[in-house]
């Protein structure tokens, strides 16, 4: 799509950029919140660190290189897509990249994109499945979840945690079954983004509080303030951008963890 798109590029498609009916700031806020989902879990390479060779070098390298390549692909493919299709066509398309390629290469091109989308989806599913079982397992090891999540089979796979988390995700999908596929996808993206942003919200200020608690000199705060404050402001902006429905859903989901946390805290001590 990127290569072919630039041969039939139409700059008129970029004007007007905002056709949502909202103000530019509101449109940018919502769009950024949706886009931010693609970069959630940028720290995910650290989660399976125990099973990675030479993690001190491999993880930073994989994170930086992988993010850079992904960012370039996203930017170039998005620009090419907008150069091929009018914004209204993109908004009404359930598969814009396939439709854009189909406009140039016909049905054959759409099928190629569909095949690549399936391959990409399977690859993403593998990665998310790994995280889906590793995070609960590590929480269980730290006595923040039941030990059932750290139980493994003969291949060292925490299969019980995988089954439980898969059931929970399936229930969430069934609750929103009345919506069409596009709305379900948007809802899940924004709700997932909100739940992750809560973590980023506290992390963005954590180093400052740690330094303050340890009574470190003011000069030690400089780098923390330079990175922490902008990150905090950006996180708050993104939380606002996900919308009321996703915020409420996220709060409900997160609230389920509160009794579990206190129960595990008491159980761990006993």
What are the functions of these language-model segments?
Residues 3, 68-80, 119, 163, ...:
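Generic alpha-helical transmembrane segments of integral inner-membrane proteins
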Residues 3, 195-196, 205, 222-270:
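A generic transmembrane alpha-helix motif of multi-pass inner-membrane proteins
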Residues 2-9, 78-85, 173-177, 204-211, ...:
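Transmembrane helix-loop junctions and nearby membrane-interface residues
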Residues 1-114, 246-249:
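Helix-loop-helix junctions that connect adjacent transmembrane segments
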Residues 64-126, 145-192:
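TM-loop-TM module centered on a large, flexible mid-protein loop between adjacent transmembrane helices
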Residues 52-56, 61-69, 125-163, 198-201, ...:
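Helix-loop-helix connectors at the membrane interface of multi-pass transporters/channels
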Residues 95-98, 112, 174-202, 217-222, ...:
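Transmembrane helix-loop boundary segments of multi-pass membrane transporters
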């Amino acid at each position: 799509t990127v290569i072919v798109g630039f041969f039939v590029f139409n700059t008129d498609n970029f004007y007007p950029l905002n056709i949502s009916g909202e103000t530019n700031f509101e449109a940018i806020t919502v769009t950024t919140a949706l886009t931010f989902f693609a970069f959630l879990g940028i720290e995910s390479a650290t989660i399976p660190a125990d099973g990675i060779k030479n993690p001190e070098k491999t993880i930073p390298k994989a994170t930086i290189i992988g993010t850079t390549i992904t960012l370039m692909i996203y930017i170039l493919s998005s620009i090419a897509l907008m150069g091929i299709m009018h914004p209204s066509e993109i908004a009404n398309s359930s598969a814009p990249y396939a439709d854009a390629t189909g406009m140039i290469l016909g049905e054959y091109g759409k099928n190629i994109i569909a095949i690549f989308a399936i391959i990409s989806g399977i690859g993403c599913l593998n990665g998310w499945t790994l995280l889906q079982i590793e995070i609960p397992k590590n929480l269980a090891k730290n006595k923040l979840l039941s030990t059932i999540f750290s139980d493994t089979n003969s291949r060292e796979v925490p299969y019980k945690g995988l089954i439980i988390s898969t059931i929970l995700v399936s229930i969430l999908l069934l609750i929103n079954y009345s919506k069409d596929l596009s709305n379900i996808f948007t809802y899940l993206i924004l709700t997932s983004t909100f739940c992750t942003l809560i973590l980023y919200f506290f992390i963005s200020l954590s180093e400052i509080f740690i330094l303050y608690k340890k009574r470190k000199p003011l000069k030690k705060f400089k780098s923390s303030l330079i990175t922490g404050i902008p990150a905090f402001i950006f996180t708050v902006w993104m939380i606002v951008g996900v919308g009321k429905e996703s915020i409420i859903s996220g709060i409900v989901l997160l609230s389920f963890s509160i009794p579990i946390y206190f129960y595990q805290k008491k159980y761990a001590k006993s």
